[in-house]
């Protein structure tokens, strides 16, 4: 690591430090500030004066202390050993920090991101004389039940002079050498602010299934898409993201707790190790990386944490896997940008946020996508970002900037959350731009009439919402029977289809075949009941029909029993309203 001439601290304003005499320093270089060697990053240069955001508490730092540049950008180490890891915002493992400094993170502490002593069983997939590209696969390492592919750095490639034999190696051992003398290890470094290069971005065509009916049916997300979950405090953003992390169909989960309360991250750290992965039967943590950057940690590290998370996600994407990144919450990240911007005395824009807020958000969300990697594999990163608008005001700058970038908008409703309706996603205020893209997949893999059924359900819910306003004004007795049927069907759809019980082992997650079966049941009920009304039945007779209870219980039926249960309910629906006359 080349060391340049030291500069000195000129002024300190919270996490922002101005250093003079920084000859040879570059933008985004990592620096060590003060005698305690606090980690910082240069975010602006003016001649030999550097503006540094410090990722640790600057209390006690004084003017005149040394500032030393490392000539390296903020980078993460990518290799075996990251899965099941819990890091802070700049990829320092929290368990190692605790061993070194106790319950609180000591300032200036330096710990290795990956275990440098553990030996990994490396199996090469290339031979001397082969040509490898950047992000090319050199071999594999088993990590838990996961096959970790060892990649060349994206900016390195060429003909291989030597490849290590199959055996056990640490991440510092050389496992291959290029003809130009470049030595390749099991791990490599990559700067977090630079997107990892790919051959090309692909048109998304597969759904990212979450296990939540309201999302998978009404507002789907594509594999490689970006979604926003805005909502006021207490509406369930964190719980919704945790549920998607548990039951989503991604191969790898990266969960970034960015500026949220420490108790919420504690819940994740306690719950996730106990969760069983439905794919492997092992712990879910074995395919999860957690980045904990809570609200009481230094503000500047929040800004870095989302870049750290997306870089880890891109690394697994380059191995040909699908990755989901949960960012909770991007509002806290934007607040960190605002604080740093104000410390640097930049001109503020709306609500004090910097004018480049939209560009920064776009630079983050646009690193999502389905791609063809440099080595020819298909991979994807799906980003789901929570937004916490103050007081639930959706017109504030972070929400509006996020809306312009993301393709799915899952609006959380405090009223639904208070009524214990989970997930508390407002079906009349949410949307997905990916629905037309996925219609073909749904027709081929779920049901040929799936898009039409979804449209009918959407129409019924909208009609029910309009009729509820009438009911609140004049009462239900003023409605005709067919309108009361719409209200009853809407209630059933809300309570027995869109709502899920997160504590129930069966209902916490639902497959698409089961969702399709439920959709057909509820619409069959509406069609048969509507026909019965036309034949002279009354709405009271229909509401008291015992088949409604069976429809309500359908979502709690296990997947392996659902087909038979659904068939029985459909048969009963065909006969139960026949011959019922007024």
Swiss-Prot record:
It catalyses: ATP + H2O + 4 H(+)(in) = ADP + phosphate + 5 H(+)(out). InterPro entries: ATP-synt_VA_C, ATP-synth_a_Xtn, ATP_synth_asu-like_sf, ATPase_a/bsu_AS, ATPase_F1/V1/A1_a/bsu_N, ATPase_F1/V1/A1_a/bsu_N_sf, ATPase_F1/V1/A1_a/bsu_nucl-bd, ATPase_F1/V1_b/a_C. Its EC number is 7.1.2.2. One of its GO terms (biological process) is proton motive force-driven plasma membrane ATP synthesis. One of its GO terms (molecular function) is proton-transporting ATP synthase activity, rotational mechanism. It is an enzyme of class 7 (translocase). One of its GO terms (cellular component) is proton-transporting ATP synthase complex. ATP binds at residues 231-238. It holds the Pfam family ATP-synt_ab. Keywords: ATP synthesis, ATP-binding, Hydrogen ion transport, Ion transport, Nucleotide-binding, Translocase, Transport. CDD domains: ATP-synt_V_A-type_alpha_C, ATP-synt_V_A-type_alpha_N, V_A-ATPase_A. Belongs to the ATPase alpha/beta chains family. PANTHER family: H(+)-TRANSPORTING TWO-SECTOR ATPASE, V-TYPE PROTON ATPASE CATALYTIC SUBUNIT A. NCBIfam families: PRK04192.1. Produces ATP from ADP in the presence of a proton gradient across the membrane. The V-type alpha chain is a catalytic subunit. This is V-type ATP synthase alpha chain. The gene is atpA.
